[in-house]
């Protein structure tokens, strides 16, 4: 039976704490030990913290409903290899970088990842995560061997590195000479994302952004951090795919309904969503469907974001 961890003052902060512990109030930090992060930015695993408004790790126990599911039972080494079949092709710049062991090691830092909900939900989350990240790192083309959706994880860095992706920020100032272009599976970009991610992982990624493209475990951790972390007004990708996100009336009027399409909106909605049919969105869906088929799970509804208003724009 899981130990119940309680804050000293119910919904509010413990008396001996001066600042919030997690969530958007703490730069996207996750609670230790898989604890729930309440809507107010505090850690515990009581219903008050894990229920309505919970920001992350909302199963509260660091290991899914059964208290300790092994992620390896959801995605085996052989499945990983088949999903990312051509990632080590000689033509792929990331050849030899992304490994199953690095993925499993990184995932241990996020106990709710791939372990929330029933088995189908867990499989669907892994399919969605790799669907989005495979698109971000794809080396495929329409007539590629085994099809375009067998070429995810071919890249670990953005091809166009001319932009510094530096947005003035007192909280996450850009380091001299550093660029925050896309790196890793999720193609983490912008100084504020590197800053928040670094805080959550205990790393100085503002001064060392290349760690996301040179350390294979950190690379996966950065991608999973982005996946697990809500950034207002966006929910987390994790909460969407596991059914823990409920759209507000504003979301509904903007066409944002639960499903894989909202995850695309979270990741790159400003460029891809609300524009009608888009080849990039279609590519994301193609990867997702291939992986769902491999896991023998349904796709769910609302796969695209063609008619969704991007978050923050309406």
Swiss-Prot record:
Domain of life: Eukaryota
Annotated GO MF terms: chitin binding
Signal peptide feature range: 1-19
GO biological process, one term: carbohydrate metabolic process
Cystine connections: 22-37, 31-43, 36-50, 54-58, 92-154, 166-174, 273-305
Matches recorded under SMART domains: ChtBD1 (SM00270)
Keywords recorded for this protein, A-Z: Allergen, Chitin-binding, Disulfide bond, Plant defense, Signal
Role: Inactive chitinase-like protein that does not exhibit hydrolytic activity toward chitin. Binds strongly to chitin and possesses antifungal activity toward the fungal pathogen Altenaria alternata in plate assays. Inhibits the growth of Fusarium oxysporum on plate assays. Probably involved in defense against fungal pathogens through a mechanism that only involves carbohydrate binding.
Family statement drawn from the similarity comment of this UniProt entry: Belongs to the glycosyl hydrolase 19 family. Chitinase class I subfamily.
This protein's name: Inactive chitinase-like protein 1
Source species of the chain: Hevea brasiliensis (Para rubber tree)
């Amino acid at each position: 039976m899981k130990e119940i961890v309680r804050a000293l003052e119910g919904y509010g902060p413990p008396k001996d704490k001066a600042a919030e512990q997690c969530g958007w109030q703490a730069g996207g930090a996750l609670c230790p030990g898989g604890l729930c992060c309440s809507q107010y930015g505090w850690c515990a695993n009581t219903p008050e913290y894990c229920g309505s408004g919970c920001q992350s790790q909302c199963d509260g126990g660091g290991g899914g409903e059964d208290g300790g599911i092994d992620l390896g039972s959801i995605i085996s080494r052989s499945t990983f290899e088949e999903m990312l079949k051509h990632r080590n092709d000689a033509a792929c710049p990331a050849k030899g970088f992304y490994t199953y062991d690095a993925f499993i090691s990184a995932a241990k830092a996020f106990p709710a990842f791939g372990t929330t909900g029933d088995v189908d939900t867990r499989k669907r989350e892994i399919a969605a995560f790799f669907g989005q990240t495979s698109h971000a790192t794809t080396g495929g083309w329409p007539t590629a061997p085994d099809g375009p959706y067998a070429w995810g994880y071919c890249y670990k860095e953005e091809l166009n590195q001319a932009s510094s992706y530096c947005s003035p920020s007192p909280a996450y100032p850009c380091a001299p000479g550093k660029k925050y272009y896309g790196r890793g599976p999720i193609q983490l970009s912008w100084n504020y994302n590197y800053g928040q991610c670094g805080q959550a992982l205990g790393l100085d990624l503002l001064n060392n952004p290349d760690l996301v493209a040179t350390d294979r475990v950190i690379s996966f951790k950065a991608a999973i951090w982005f996946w697990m972390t809500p950034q207002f007004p966006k929910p987390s990708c994790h909460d969407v795919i596991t059914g823990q996100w409920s759209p507000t009336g504003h979301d509904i009027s903007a066409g944002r309904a639960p499903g894989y399409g909202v995850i695309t909106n979270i990741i790159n909605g400003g460029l891809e969503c609300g524009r009608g049919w888009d080849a990039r969105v279609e590519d994301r869906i193609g990867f997702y469907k291939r992986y769902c088929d491999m896991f023998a799970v349904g796709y769910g509804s609302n796969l695209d974001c063609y008619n969704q208003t991007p978050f923050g724009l309406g």
